[in-house]
Each structure stands twice: as structure tokens, then as C-alpha cells.
């Protein structure tokens, strides 16, 4: 740990600043004098050479032409967008009109050489006067700052003394009367102490007032120094040197133009084309001459001598196929994650740039550092995303279903970003500090899923055109055999629980009595009407009469592990069903509680390692959400679950076998608005933990084909069979039941 920086006195800091100001002004003055001297000597030499007629002029120009300038070639000598050809053409034109310079030697002496010497002499004198005046002004400011330091010191001493007297008086007032002390003596001491405290308070107040007045005067003096005195000194030091320099530069070209028509044509052409010098063209020439900056050839695949393949290969039904699918899923997840990182960092960058003016001077450097870090993070995320997209393009070329994984991952990320946008509080500026700038930065370090609990609720939009409140119970009218992995086989007269709509019309997602979930044709089902509630309750009562007689051992282990295990154990909840594509991947249903073993790996592919039902494996992190500290078993209701007896079902009206979450987990699913987090009361937990009836067995935990995480069907639903296939005698009326 480094020691804290040493505090520098205000007076010493002011002296250092003033010394640096003086040094910079002298350096600026010296540079201007050097430029005047260069112009003066150049005019003298040129006039002397003109006296010697053409020989002397050619000698002068040849001295400058001998220098090798980069970017000057024979084929681009007439391209005046480059600065070096312009300067070279100027020297060549000088040599061409050498004989005409004899008549203008006096003009150089009268208009440039002598005035430049006079201007430089005056500038040296002005520098001496300005330095003396600036030194005097700086000394006055130093004296003001010294008075401020004295007033501050006196204020601190008197205030500390007054504080000590006040503390002593408070202690004496709270002390009890001793056996050997009389009340009169205590009163005298109290009066004396109060007088002392009043005197110290008066001195402290006087010192504070003097300090504040001195502070105001010092600030005013400092403002005067920077806004008036320093500006006037710099203006006096510059004088009219820039006007003289401008006149000298004009005199060089004007004198040459007035010599003769040939000279006029030459320098008029140079004058017009000198303004065409641009940085982009000079940079282009530089890149053309230096091949080291050119883009090299793409890297080529170098096969082994015995290998004849030159591209990715996929064999159906082999491990390679699963490996390529895993790579597609891995890099699609990475693309989505980096897209989210770019959006977050761009949001941080916009906040920093928009609120930069409100930041105080002390934190300006920190603000610039944060802006640079945000831009660097965006650049890195764009590179990672570009590399991942290149991998996906190559996988797509050989037929891997890249679009499926990419669409699924991007939909998830876009829903999270939309939810974050609505849940994101506005930026608040207070005391020059932006309190909302760190929120988006911290979000990149740990993805926040707490605001995304309502993202997956699709019940508000029904593709079929009918608004329904899911889940609801319906009856199968026609039998249907699943033809796709994400579909569900149903039998006639079977009772299903419809949980949500599909993306395409005439498809809905349903769960059967054994807990299997999949898509079924909507027209194959009979949805409940507004009557026959009693018959529906009677037909469904038997399915749930035994739901409160058994408990789940996995739930008991989870609660016990949360209470008795390590406090650092982290749990996550599955947002979708997932089936592992390889042996080392973990399979789990929606709502499952998974214990996290490791969040970091060497590939950084978005996969975490966890344990579920005694099995250890890896799984995509975008399919789960982290549970908060209260949900990991640190709240009292988790302890009450173990000791509270299960309530017996009411004899008159048994509960309906409708579930707000998959039977594989005792906790509510995040895509149901009726429950966001774990239950908050013991009674609510008991109902949730014992809501699983024997009719909905645990055998459906590993049914990945019907997972929520896969894409919804985009195929057309099959038409229902003819009406003769249905037996009208067995028509059953259903009723829509919404759980609260």
C-alpha cells in the first residue's frame, strides 16, 4: 500500500505555478524572435545573392534543394496537395527567375531585413518590461495568499481551543456533586468556565469571519490576476509582432510577383495551390511509400501432410456434429453478450460525455479516464463480437443452424436491454458528482437479472386474436402425434394445461398431467367457457387430492444446504428448460435451482459449471438468473419451511391441479407475473413446496425437446380432422381458471 500524497502548501503551489507561467512566456517570446531572425537573415542572404545576379540566386536556392524531403517523386511534382512539392516548386521558381532579382535587392532590405531587426529589438525591450511587471503582480498575489494562510491558521487554532473549552464545560455540567465540594464552589467554577467558553467562542467567531473575508478577497485577487493582469501582460508582450510577420510573408510573394510577368505567374500559381495542402493526401502518400502499413494477405490454412480436408466438416449423428452445434451456441451467446456490453458501455459513454460539464475540476481527470475506459471497452467488445461473427459465418457455410442459436440469444439480450431501459433511473447530478455513472459500469461486472423477471411473460399478446389469462385448463378434442422435438403428443379427451401462446397462429404451449411441455395445435383443443365450474372442479379434484401428502427431497436438500452450508454458496434459477448437447453439459427444466460451482473458465464462452440433482456439468449462463442473498436461504422463512407442518387439504373443496411453475421445481417460474421471487411467508412457501401432485411426476425433469429456451415453431399448424371423428356425446364444457 502506497503512502498518501504529501500535502503542498498553498503558497508554495502558487509559486510553482507562477514560475512555470514565466518560463512558458519566455519560451514563446524566444520562438517568435527566432522566427523573426530567420526571416531577416533569409532576406539579407537573398538580397546579397541577387546582387551577384543569377549565380548567387541559384546558389541560395540550390542549398535548400539539396535537402531530401520525403514524399517528393518525379511523377508527383505537380501535385500540390502535398506540402513538400509546394516548397520544392517554390525553390525551383526562385532559380528560374534569378536574373530578375537584381532589381529587388533594395526591397528586401527596406521591407524585411531592417524592419525585422527593429521589431526584434523592440520585442526584447518589451520582454524585460513585461517580466518586471509580471513579477510584481505575482508577488502581490503571493502576499494575498500568505494572508489567507495566516487567517486560516488563526481560525483553526481559535476554533480548536473553543471546542476544547466547550467539551470541558459539557463534562462539568454533567458531573455529579462530590461529598467534599460545596454548591457555591461549583457555581463559581461554572461561572468562570462559562465566561471562558464565551470568550473562546467570541474569538473563534472573529477568526472565522476574518478567514472568510480574507478568502473572498484572495479569490477576487486571483480572478483579477487571471482575467485581467495576465491577459494584459501577454497582449503587451506579443505587441504587433504577428502583423509584422504577416507583412513580411506577404512582402516575399508580392516582391517576386512585381518583378516581371514570369515571376508573377510562378508565384501566383504557388500562392493559389499552397492552400490545397491537406493532411489526408499527405497521409495517403506516406502509406503508399511505406508498405509496412499495408494490410497483409489473409492467414491461410496450413494443413498437415496427411490431411486432405480444407474446411469444417460435420458428420450426422457423431460427436463432431454436437461439437459444431456447441460451438455455434457458444459463439452466438458470445455475440449477444458482447452486443449487450457495447450497449451498456455506449450508455455509460453518453452519460459521461453529456454530464462532463457538471463535473468539478478535481474529478475532471477521473472523468476523462472513465471516458477512455468506456471507449476501450467498446473497442474490445467490438473486436470480440467481430471474431465471434466470423466463426459463426464459417459454421453457417457448412449448414450449422447458426441463425437459430443467434436469434435465441439476441432475443434474450434484447428483452433484457429493454427491461433495463425501463427500469433504469434517470441520471442525477449533485455537488458536481454524477451518481448514475457507476451504475452502468458495475452492471458489466455482474449481469443484473433482478429487473428482468417480467420479460418472458407473453400472455399479453395472443397470436390467435383471443386474449386469455394463462395458465388455463382445456380438453383435447382431437388426438395429435408430435412431429417435431418441441411438440407434444396428445390424446383425445386428455386434460391439458395451456401455459402460453406460440409465435405463430394456431399453436399454443401446453403441459400434460405427467409434466411434459410442448407445442400443440390450438384448434385441437377445447378452451373453457364461463359456465360448468362445478363439473370442472369435480373432474380435476382427484388429480390434486394427493398433492399435499408428499414432499420433494430435492427441495429439502436445497433448504438444508442453504441453512447449514457455506454462506458463500451461490444458487441460480433456470429461466428455460435446457438439454445438454454433450456429456459434460447439464440438463435441467425451467425453474430448477442449480448450485454454482464455477463461473470462470479458460474459454470465457458464457458457460458456468453447476450441480443439479447430484450431477455436475456446464450450462449457458444466459438461461439462468442469480438468486439474491435472501433467496439463497438467509431469511427466516427458509428456516420455517423445515419446521412448519404441511397443512392438510380442505375436505370440502380440494385445490385445483393448476400450477404456476413447472412441476420440476418448487419455486415460481420467472415468466409468470403472479410470482416474482421466492414466497415471503411460510404459508405461501408450504403451498408452493407441496403443490406437486403424484399425477405430475418428476420423470419429466429431463425433457429438453419441450424447453422454453428453444425457438417457437414457425410452421403452419395442421388442420383439425373432420367433425365425424369427434364423438359429440362426450362433449365437456370447461371453465377458465386464473391462479392468483
Swiss-Prot record:
Q: Where is the composition biased (Basic and acidic residues)?
A: 307-323
- Annotated region described as Disordered, given as residue ranges: 303-323, 633-740
Membrane topology note: Peripheral membrane protein
Indicate yes or no for the key word Lipid metabolism: no
> Listed GO cellular component terms?
anchoring junction; clathrin-coated pit; neuromuscular junction; plasma membrane; recycling endosome; stereocilium shaft
The compartments listed are:
Cytoplasm; Cell junction; Membrane, Clathrin-coated pit; Cell membrane
Q: Mark out the compositionally biased spans (Pro residues).
A: 646-657
Consequence of changing residue 681 to A: Impaired recruitment to the cell membrane
A molecular function (GO) held by this record is: phosphatidylinositol-3,4-bisphosphate binding
Residue pairs linked by disulfide bridges in the UniProt entry: none
Q: What is the effect of changing residue 576 to S?
A: Abolishes interaction with ITSN1 and location at clathrin-coated pits
UniProt-recorded name of the protein: F-BAR and double SH3 domains protein 2
Q: What species is this protein from?
A: Homo sapiens
Amino acid at each position: 500500500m502506497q503512502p498518501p500524497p504529501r500535502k503542498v502548501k498553498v503558497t508554495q503551489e502558487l509559486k510553482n505555478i507562477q514560475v512555470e507561467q514565466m518560463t512558458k512566456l519566455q519560451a514563446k517570446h524566444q520562438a517568435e524572435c527566432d522566427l523573426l531572425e530567420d526571416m531577416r537573415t533569409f532576406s539579407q542572404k537573398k538580397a546579397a545573392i541577387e546582387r551577384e545576379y543569377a549565380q548567387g540566386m541559384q546558389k541560395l536556392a540550390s542549398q535548400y534543394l539539396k535537402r531530401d524531403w520525403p514524399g517528393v517523386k518525379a511523377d508527383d511534382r505537380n501535385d500540390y496537395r502535398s506540402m513538400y512539392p509546394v516548397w520544392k516548386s517554390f525553390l525551383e521558381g526562385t532559380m528560374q527567375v534569378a536574373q530578375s532579382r537584381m532589381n529587388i535587392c533594395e526591397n528586401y532590405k527596406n521591407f524585411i531585413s531592417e524592419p525585422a531587426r527593429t521589431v526584434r529589438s523592440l520585442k526584447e525591450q518589451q520582454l524585460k518590461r513585461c517580466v518586471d511587471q509580471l513579477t510584481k503582480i505575482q508577488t502581490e498575489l503571493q502576499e494575498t495568499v500568505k494572508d489567507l494562510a495566516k487567517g486560516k491558521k488563526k481560525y483553526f487554532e481559535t476554533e480548536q481551543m473553543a471546542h476544547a473549552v466547550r467539551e470541558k464545560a459539557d463534562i462539568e455540567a454533567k458531573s455529579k456533586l462530590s461529598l467534599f465540594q460545596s454548591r457555591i464552589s461549583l457555581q463559581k467554577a461554572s461561572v468562570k468556565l462559562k465566561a471562558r467558553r464565551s470568550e473562546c467562542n467570541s474569538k473563534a467567531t472573529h477568526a472565522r469571519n476574518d478567514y472568510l473575508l480574507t478568502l473572498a478577497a484572495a479569490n477576487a485577487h486571483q480572478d483579477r490576476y487571471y482575467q485581467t493582469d495576465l491577459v494584459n501582460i501577454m497582449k503587451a508582450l506579443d505587441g504587433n509582432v504577428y502583423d509584422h510577420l504577416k507583412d513580411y510573408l506577404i512582402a516575399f510573394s508580392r516582391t517576386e510577383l512585381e518583378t516581371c510577368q514570369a515571376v508573377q505567374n510562378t508565384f501566383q500559381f504557388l500562392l493559389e495551390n499552397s492552400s490545397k495542402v491537406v493532411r489526408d493526401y499527405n497521409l495517403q502518400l506516406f502509406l503508399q511509400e511505406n508498405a509496412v502499413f499495408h494490410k497483409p494477405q489473409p492467414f491461410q490454412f496450413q494443413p498437415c501432410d496427411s490431411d486432405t480436408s480444407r474446411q469444417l466438416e460435420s458428420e450426422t449423428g457423431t460427436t463432431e456434429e454436437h461439437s459444431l452445434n456447441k460451438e455455434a451456441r457458444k459463439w452466438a451467446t458470445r455475440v449477444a453478450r458482447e452486443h449487450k456490453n457495447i450497449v451498456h458501455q455506449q450508455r455509460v459513454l453518453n452519460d459521461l460525455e453529456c454530464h462532463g460539464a457538471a463535473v468539478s475540476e478535481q474529478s475532471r481527470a477521473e472523468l476523462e479516464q472513465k471516458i477512455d475506459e468506456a471507449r476501450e471497452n467498446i473497442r474490445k467488445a467490438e473486436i470480440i463480437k467481430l471474431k465471434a461473427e466470423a466463426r459463426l459465418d464459417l459454421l453457417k457455410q457448412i449448414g450449422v443452424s447458426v441463425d437459430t442459436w443467434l436469434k435465441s440469444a439476441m432475443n434474450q439480450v434484447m428483452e433484457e436491454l429493454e427491461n433495463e431501459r425501463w427500469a433504469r433511473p434517470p441520471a442525477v447530478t449533485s455537488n458536481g458528482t454524477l451518481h448514475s455513472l457507476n451504475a452502468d459500469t458495475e452492471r458489466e461486472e455482474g449481469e443484473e437479472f433482478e429487473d428482468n423477471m417480467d420479460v418472458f411473460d407473453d400472455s399479453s399478446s395472443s397470436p390467435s386474436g383471443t386474449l386469455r389469462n394463462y395458465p388455463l385448463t382445456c380438453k383435447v378434442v382431437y388426438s395429435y402425434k408430435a412431429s417435431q422435438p418441441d411438440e407434444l403428443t396428445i390424446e383425445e379427451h386428455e386434460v391439458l394445461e395451456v401455459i402460453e401462446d406460440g409465435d405463430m397462429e394456431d399453436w399454443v404451449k401446453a403441459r400434460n398431467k405427467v409434466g411434459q411441455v410442448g407445442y400443440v395445435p390450438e384448434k385441437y383443443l377445447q378452451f373453457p367457457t364461463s359456465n360448468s365450474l362445478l363439473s370442472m372442479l369435480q373432474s380435476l379434484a382427484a388429480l390434486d387430492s394427493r398433492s399435499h401428502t408428499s414432499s420433494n427431497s430435492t427441495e429439502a436438500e436445497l433448504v438444508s444446504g442453504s441453512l447449514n452450508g457455506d454462506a458463500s454458496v451461490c444458487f441460480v434459477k433456470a429461466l428455460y428448460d435446457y438439454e445438454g448437447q454433450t456429456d459434460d453439459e447439464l440438463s435441467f427444466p425451467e425453474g430448477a435451482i442449480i448450485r454454482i460451482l464455477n463461473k470462470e473458465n479458460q474459454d470465457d464462452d458464457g458457460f458456468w459449471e453447476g450441480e443439479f440433482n447430484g450431477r455436475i456439468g456446464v450450462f449457458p449462463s444466459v438461461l439462468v438468473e442469480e438468486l439474491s442473498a435472501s433467496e439463497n436461504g438467509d431469511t427466516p422463512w427458509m428456516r420455517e419451511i423445515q419446521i412448519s407442518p404441511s397443512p392438510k387439504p380442505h375436505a370440502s373443496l380440494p385445490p385445483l391441479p393448476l400450477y404456476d411453475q413447472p412441476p420440476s421445481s418448487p419455486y415460481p417460474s420467472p415468466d409468470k407475473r403472479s410470482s416474482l421471487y421466492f414466497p415471503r411467508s411460510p404459508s405461501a412457501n408450504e403451498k408452493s413446496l407441496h403443490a406437486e401432485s403424484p399425477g405430475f411426476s418428476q420423470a419429466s425433469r429431463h425433457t429438453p425437446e419441450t424447453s422454453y429456451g428453444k425457438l417457437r415453431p414457425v410452421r403452419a399448424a395442421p388442420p383439425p380432422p373432420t367433425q365425424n371423428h369427434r364423438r359429440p356425446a362426450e362433449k365437456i364444457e370447461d371453465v377458465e381458471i386464473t391462479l392468483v
